[in-house]
């Protein structure tokens, strides 16, 4: 295999960044695959995601020229390429997008000429191989390509509104129905006449001859609700170019899977699966999915059964299923990671740093899925064998998903390979029904949001609560109820109040929202029961009006519940110390996965692969309390994001940060945090862990208390200790030794009791044999045995069977008013005519009991009383009837 070296993927990356750095661009790192504070987006799926707020006007950046290589994922939600991966030349779950951006600085002239310079001069692409498209009314771009760059007119294609509506075009970009939009120009590479396909805009444009390599978007309009376009005061540029697609062209291969990066991964997959044919599509799937899975785990996503974690689990399981198809029955997928690090670790140091954690996560998932895959394939085969029309019923696909953990796209994948399909309508119907059943009503206020139009009219809430817990002059800018916006509200109404400023902290970063009161000078009073953040920038006071009324424009005073805020601050600072201690004890793979910072407790979820031993728990608790006793000053600074990271600050999973961040330092703990904290660590007083458990694969949870709550917990534990000491006749200091003596004594007595029971059973057997009734040459024994439990009854039953070759036996052990029943049928004379389970039901129903078993043995129970005697007395008659 000949892997080209002149333009490796690594060199293409560095060429791109170096080129735009020399053009005055700030080089920024790739944003995480998990978008911060954007619930509408499952994953970062394009280069513009991290700059979305800039284009919407919600975020200001100091840099006006930026370039980056953005990691992207399309494997869930609206943008989902998962089904196509491995079967086409250019679909991937994970891909890298090269992009350069202008925020009100340069525009079309620079973007177009620089793109041409990079492609033809740096990367040496023949100009005659390039073709460009422009929006049909974008005469400016057309003229720049023709007159300044020199592209012949027959290589410039105007694309109109080809999607059925005004401005609905491949060459007109818009973020939504309203807002920033504009024309785009795309650069295509022509593979030559020997490849089928026509130029863009032609009937044959879907062929492989002309491949889009770079899209230059010119955001120059603001689209109004009536469809009109208003010029933006500061037009922007947004460009995107797929690294893998470009590498295929520069390396003179026709599919992305033939480039150097993928060939290295495919060779490794072939080695791990012992497959000689490197063209095997399953190897492509494994190679592609190794990148997606590794980078998702690096960015804090772990396999689970919901949300992003479920998408990761689906990708892992799809790769494992393709390994299974190749005959692999042992874990292998995790061993792709070292090769991935070798080809991408230099560009992404975070991948190199997290390699061990990634491998452990993948290995755990492989071991978990091995049995599921085996069982799921058997079920699929059974279903497929019964299908006559080639369509797997949606109900069966849902059963595979819900009961056996088989993602539906995996079922569809297998079906497709067999020339079948899945009834997705039926599957979605079953899924919808399950969601309806499981859905619970949400808390008031959490589901209410502002419209984008209304939000654009408001300025973000100014938070005063770091310095003050009471503030006057808070102007009401909006009122919301479950029905949406309202202009006013009166006594008894529950509303969400938005003010221009507030001392109330809005729930975020795991810290609960503040409570308190909002008041006006005319006696108006609102009880604030929660504070939620709306659209990431507005503080919504969830309140009930207890006196007077409130309307938009009113001016209020706000008071936060001080004692509660302080208790929350204690717990928030304690989570920082706990996080630091966990990383110190277990290593840097420990990353916060979620938290709850409430006034009465804290909950901290973190990545770790095994339960925490008691000794480790003690060590962690001691380390936190050492930091508490050190009484460190809690220092809070505002600084640039990069400066904070250079200073060692930890950025938390799932959080979005701006250019300037708030850095909280206490002792050796340094974190980016927008929450509220104490002044000194000594204010925490005492830190006490109250529980530790696993919440999902690779995620552990610690719950703890601080301050007075911790003291109360310790006092309660001490009280329980004294209670236990009193119950066993010991003092508190000697409880453990005393309990050890009691347990030793208990074990001795239990052994003696077993011996006595054995003797009792031996004597009982002799008595029972003497009471046996002969019914048609079958011995029938039906007896009450006081004091014998189920285990002793079964032993007595087994001994009787050894001495009675043809017998029907019913034994009733009575203890504390409860009856344990066992029945047995032994020997050829009775077997087949008398069934032990039927006999047991006959007896049990007479004593308000029940049970079950086999034809030769059954067990159950019931209640003691006069009916037991008559039930046992009637056994011989019942047996006689069945034998005859």
UniProtKB/Swiss-Prot annotation:
Gene3D superfamilies membership: 2.40.30.130, 3.10.310.40, 3.30.54.20, 6.10.250.550, Bira Bifunctional Protein, Domain 2, Threonyl-trna Synthetase, Chain A, domain 2
Stored PROSITE patterns: AA_TRNA_LIGASE_II_ALA (PS50860)
Cofactor(s) annotated in UniProt: Zn(2+)
Pfam families named among the record's database cross-references: DHHA1 (PF02272), tRNA-synt_2c (PF01411), tRNA_SAD (PF07973)
Keywords annotated in UniProt: Aminoacyl-tRNA synthetase, ATP-binding, Cytoplasm, Ligase, Metal-binding, Nucleotide-binding, Protein biosynthesis, RNA-binding, tRNA-binding, Zinc
EC number in record: 6.1.1.7
SMART domains recorded: tRNA_SAD (SM00863)
Annotated binding of Zn(2+), by residue: 572, 576, 673, 677
Top-level class of the enzyme under EC nomenclature: ligase
GO terms assigned for molecular function: alanine-tRNA ligase activity; aminoacyl-tRNA deacylase activity; ATP binding; tRNA binding; zinc ion binding
Cellular localization per UniProt: Cytoplasm
Presence of keyword Magnesium: no
The family this protein is said to belong to: Belongs to the class-II aminoacyl-tRNA synthetase family.
Protein name in UniProt: Alanine--tRNA ligase
Gene: alaS
């Amino acid at each position: 295999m000949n892997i080209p070296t002149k333009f490796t993927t690594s060199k293409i990356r560095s060429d791109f960044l170096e080129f735009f750095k020399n053009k005055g661009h700030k080089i920024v790192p790739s944003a995480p695959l998990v978008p911060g504070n954007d619930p509408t987006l499952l994953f970062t799926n394009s280069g513009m995601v991290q700059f979305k707020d800039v284009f919407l006007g919600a975020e200001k950046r100091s840099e006006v020229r930026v370039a980056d290589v953005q990691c992207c994922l399309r494997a869930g939600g609206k943008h989902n390429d998962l089904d196509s991966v491995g079967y086409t030349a250019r679909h991937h779950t994970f891909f890298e997008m090269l992009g350069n951006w202008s925020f009100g600085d340069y525009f079309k002239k620079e973007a177009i000429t620089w793109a041409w310079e990079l492609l033809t001069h740096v990367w040496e692409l023949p100009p005659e191989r390039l073709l460009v498209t422009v929006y049909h009314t974008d005469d400016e771009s057309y003229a720049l390509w023709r007159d300044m760059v020199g592209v012949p007119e027959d290589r410039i294609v105007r694309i109109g509104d080809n999607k059925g509506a005004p401005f609905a075009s491949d060459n007109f970009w818009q973020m939504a129905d309203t807002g920033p939009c504009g024309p785009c120009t795309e650069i295509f590479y022509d593979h030559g006449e020997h490849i089928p396909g026509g130029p863009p805009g032609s009937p044959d444009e879907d062929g492989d001859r002309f491949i889009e390599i770079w899209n230059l978007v010119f955001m120059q309009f603001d689209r109004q609700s009536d469809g009109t376009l208003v010029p933006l005061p500061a037009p922007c540029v947004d460009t995107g170019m797929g690294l893998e697609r470009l590498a295929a062209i520069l390396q003179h291969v026709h599919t992305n899977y033939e480039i150097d990066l993928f060939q290295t991964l495919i060779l490794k997959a072939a080695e791990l699966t012992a497959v000689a044919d490197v063209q095997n599509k399953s190897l492509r799937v494994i190679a592609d999915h190794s990148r997606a899975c590794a980078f998702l785990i690096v960015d804090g996503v772990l396999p689970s059964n919901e949300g992003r974690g479920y998408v990761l689990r689906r990708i892992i399981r799809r790769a494992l299923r393709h390994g299974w198809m190749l005959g692999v029955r042992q874990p292998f997928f995790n061993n792709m990671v070292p090769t991935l690090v070798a080809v991408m670790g230099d560009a992404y140091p975070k991948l190199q740093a997290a390699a061990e954690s990634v491998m452990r996560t993948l290995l755990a998932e492989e071991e978990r899925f091995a049995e599921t895959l085996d069982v799921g394939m058997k079920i699929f085969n059974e279903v497929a064998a019964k299908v006559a029309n080639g369509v797997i019923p949606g109900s069966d696909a849902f059963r595979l998903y819900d009961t056996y953990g088989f993602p539906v796209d995996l079922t569809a994948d297998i079906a497709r390979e067999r020339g079948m399909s899945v009834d997705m309508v039926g599957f979605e119907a079953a899924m919808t029904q399950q969601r309806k059943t499981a859905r619970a009503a949400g808390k008031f206020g959490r589901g209410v949001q502002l419209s984008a139009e209304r939000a654009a009219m408001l300025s973000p809430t100014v938070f005063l609560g770091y310095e003050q817990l009471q503030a006057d002059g808070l102007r009401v800018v909006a009122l919301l109820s479950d029905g949406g916006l309202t202009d006013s509200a009166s006594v008894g109404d529950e509303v969400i109040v938005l003010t221009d400023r507030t001392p109330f902290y809005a729930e975020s970063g795991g810290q609960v929202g503040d409570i308190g009161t909002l008041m006006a000078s005319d006696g108006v009073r609102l009880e604030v029961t929660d504070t939620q953040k709306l659209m990431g920038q507005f503080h919504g006071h969830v309140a009930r009006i207890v006196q007077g009324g409130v309307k938009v424009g009113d001016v209020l005073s706000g008071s936060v519940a001080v004692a509660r805020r302080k208790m929350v601050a204690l717990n928030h600072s304690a989570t920082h110390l706990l996080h630091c201690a966990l990383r110190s004890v277990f290593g840097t793979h420990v990353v916060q996965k979620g938290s709850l910072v409430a006034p009465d407790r804290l909950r901290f979820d973190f990545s770790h692969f095994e339960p925490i031993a008691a000794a480790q728990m003690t060590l962690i608790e001691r380390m936190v309390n050492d930091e508490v006793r050190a009484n460190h000053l809690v220092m809070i600074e505002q600084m640039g994001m990069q400066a904070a990271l250079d200073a060692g600050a930890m950025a938390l999973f799932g959080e979005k940060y701006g250019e300037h961040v708030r850095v909280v330092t206490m002792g050796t703990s340094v974190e980016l945090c927008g929450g509220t904290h104490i002044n000194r660590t000594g204010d925490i007083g005492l830190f006490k862990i109250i529980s530790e458990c696993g919440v999902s694969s690779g995620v552990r949870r610690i719950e703890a208390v601080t301050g007075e709550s911790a003291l109360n917990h310790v006092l309660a534990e001490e009280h329980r200790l004294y209670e236990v000491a009193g119950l066993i006749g010991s003092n508190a200091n000697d409880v453990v030794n005393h309990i050890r003596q009691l347990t030793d004594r208990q074990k001795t007595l239990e052994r003696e009791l077993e011996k006595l029971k054995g003797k009792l059973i031996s004597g009982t057997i002799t008595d029972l044999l003497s009471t046996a009734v002969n019914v048609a040459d079958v011995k029938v024994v039906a007896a009450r045995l006081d004091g014998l439990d189920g285990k002793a009854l079964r032993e007595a039953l087994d001994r009787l069977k050894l001495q009675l070759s043809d017998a029907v036996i019913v034994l009733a052990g009575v203890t504390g008013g409860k009856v344990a029943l066992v029945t047995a049928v032994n020997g050829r004379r009775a077997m087949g005519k008398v069934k032990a389970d039927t006999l047991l039901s006959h007896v049990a129903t007479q004593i308000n009991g029940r049970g079950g078993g086999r034809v030769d043995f059954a067990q159950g129970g019931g209640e003691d009383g006069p009916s037991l005697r008559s039930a046992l007395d009637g056994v011989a008659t019942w047996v006689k009837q069945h034998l005859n």
